[in-house]
Structures are given as C-alpha cells and as structure tokens.
Amino acid sequence: MTRKYFGTDGVRGRVGQSPITPDFVMRLGYSAGKALLGRSEMPAGDRPAVLIGKDTRLSGYMLESALEAGFSAAGVEVCLVGPLPTPAVAYLTRALRLQAGIVISASHNPYYDNGIKFFSAQGTKLPDEVERAIEAGIDQPMVCAPPADLGRVRRIEDARGRYIEFCKSTFPNDLDLRGLKIVIDCAHGAAYHIAPSVFHELGADVVSIGVQPNGLNINDAVGATAPKALCEAVLANRADLGIALDGDADRLQMVDAEGNLYDGDQLLYAIVRSRARSAPVKGVAGTLMSNLALEHALAKLNIPFARAAVGDRYVVEMLSEKGWLFGGENSGHILALDRHTTGDGIVAALQVLAALRELGGSLKELLGGLVLYPQKLINVPVMRGFPWKEHPAITSALADTEVSLQGRGRVLLRASGTEPLLRVMVEGEDAVEVTYAAEKLAAVVRESAQ
C-alpha cells in the first residue's frame, strides 16, 4: 500500500498549499493523536503526551498552533519546546518518557517549505505501518473529545539546556576541545542557540555564523547545503576546521583548515576508523547514494558494508536488523547508535572531533585514507509520482549508461522522497566520463518528463 501524504521524511511541501495548510495539519495532529490513543499501553486514566518542536521558519508558529489543536482535540497532552533541532526532539521524547515527538521542519529546504515528521517513544522514526495508520484517519471526520477530556498544553522550559548537556555527554570525558578554533554554521536554523554553546563549553574557541534567524533566512546561502560561506569563514578566521549544520541540525558537513569540504561518507569513515581501533566494528550501513570509495576503504579495514534505501530511517532499520552501530548518508546524516537513536549533526561532529583528538593530526590527515570517486548528481524536476520506469526512452538510456561504464562505476535513477525531482547519479573512476554520462541520461529524463 503506497502512502498518500508521507514521504521518506514525514509530510513536506510548500506552505499554504496542500498538504501544508493549517486545516490539514490540525487533522494530521488529530489523527496521530487518535492513533496514539488506540495503541497506548498506558494505565487506565492516564493519557499519552507528545512533544512538539520546530525549526526557525516563520510558518512554524502557524503550524505549531494547528498541530497543538489537533492533538488537544483528540485528548492528547502536548509539550512545547519552541525552536529545537530534530535530534533534540528525538532525545527529549525518550528522556521525558513521552509517547511521540513531532518536528515541524523542512530540514534543508528554503523557508517557504515546511513539513511534519514524527518520532516514536524510543526516539526513532515511526515505522511505515504507523504512518499508514495515521494517514488512514486524516480524511475522516474529526470528533472532538469531551471538554473535560481535551489535552492540556504546557511548555518545557529547560529543553535547550537538557539537550546541550546530552550532546556534551557523547564526547569522551577524558578529552576536550581546548586549542581548537572552530567555525560553526547553524544555517539560521534550529541549532542557532545550541551548537555554539556545546562546542564552547567543551573548550573550543568558537566563531559562529548562520545564527541570526528571522523566519525567512533558514538555509539561505548558509548551512550544510551551501558550504561556501563556511569555507570562506574558516579561511578568513584562520580556524582549524568548520562545522556546517542544516536547518534542523540533523545533517553535517565539515571543512578543514585549507577550506576543503568533507561530506557524510568521509565523516562516517573517520568515525568508524577511530572506533575500530578500540573495539571491533561489526559493519556499516550506507545507502544507494553512498560513494563506492567508502565501501572499498571499509573493506581494507575488514568491515562489512551494506546499502539501504535512501533515507536515514531506512539506514536505522538496516542497522537494527543487523545489530550494527554505524551508518549514514553522503548528504550528512550520520548515525552512531551507541550515542543517539537518530542522525544528529552536533553529536556526529563531536564523534569526528573525538577521532581527531584520539588519532592526532588535522582533519585532512584524519581523512587521508578515503579518496572519493567522482560522482555527478543531477536533479531533474518532474511531476510528483512521475512513472519513469514506464518510459522506454528512459529505461533504454539507463541500460546504455550502465553498459558504457563497463564495470568502472555505477548509475542510479531514483525519485526524491521529499521533492518532485528525479535524481540522476553516475559514479566512476573517470570524472569526465561520469559527467558526460550523467548529463546525457538527465537530458533523456528531462525530455521524457515534459
């Protein structure tokens, strides 16, 4: 059964257009509340409670009120925390023993988009079957709980401080960051009032950029998806390294002292390489988009590697199935399940810095064992749900591309789970060949989608 509203990371879209409207979000909250009531194993007389956080988008205030109203109408208690990173909501949901956590965010997207994503009581993304149960109730009539049974709403005042202390607890007690000058780019997003404090309190000399949100500038030429600002700031401040988060702080990119950028594959490798020195690493999970060089570098360390579907939720599922701890995406979602239940940009950066402290040297030296293969990714706009597999011209061009690579690389064609895009990715040893093959295939997709 396909999902009508949920993508790979919750419900997302343009604010004011279906489904990101106040009416829909209220019904989403109500349906989620009823689903929680139906599945709750709480003692009789108790009622479930949820945590609602958001990033810094202006539309977050409107959607927060709608979501709050929906849960209250269903008879579910609501705890509000205001702007807070997505992984902070996951942590606090678990720490406060609540039944679900909800984040109002469109992650790395521009301010005019927004979305809703859910976490379970364990701080993990909801399973597909629970999302389907929520979807099934969205289009049903709302029946408000009796006045005496409406959910109460309260604000958690110490949420920021609790999460800062949690992040610090994931860094080794016998290490600190004294002597390091670090530039941190918070993308004018949810970590603007948190990330600088974490690294400062651990001893680093911190320079902050992207920490002046105005509701409209989230991810605007800053953050993990626009790292040029960070590269320039690292060089201008003569910093040792830079850290870039996205709007909801669940993904990470880093920059060394020379302005070289490192993606999720490289940072995951640094963490795993360091951890493997102290204890065996059973395996690492990536995705279909993970660079082949990561797989080959891990093989040299005798560490198995497996690919999940794109989306950090599927990486988590694979890690759980295999009993592994480490995984991630090249986009910067990095998982260390012995530290957190979900991808966390701040926690991941701390794990890289711990590796840097334990192994010595610079960030560039730390990542010297992994040279990425050239990879070309082209996003082609298409109608949502575009059936590309039914277009002979596309499937034929895809097959021709695979033949042309002659085993020297790979090609991937997949629909985005969050945007109306078809992603064309070609990877191989020769950069010129890779670029040519990707552009040729993308041109066929573009023509077929018209």
Swiss-Prot record:
EC nos: 5.4.2.10
Q: Can you quote a single GO CC term?
A: cytosol
The cofactors named for this UniProt entry are: Mg(2+)
- What GO molecular function annotations does the UniProt record carry, in alphabetical order? magnesium ion binding; phosphoglucosamine mutase activity; phosphomannomutase activity
Modification note: Activated by phosphorylation.
**Which residues are catalytic?**
S107
Q: Which residues are listed for Mg(2+) binding in this entry?
A: S107, D246, D248, D250
Q: What is known about what this protein does? A: Catalyzes the conversion of glucosamine-6-phosphate to glucosamine-1-phosphate.
Q: Which NCBIfam families match?
A: glmM, PRK10887.1
Kindly provide the name given to this protein in its UniProt entry: Phosphoglucosamine mutase
Species of provenance: Dechloromonas aromatica (strain RCB)
Q: Which gene encodes it?
A: glmM
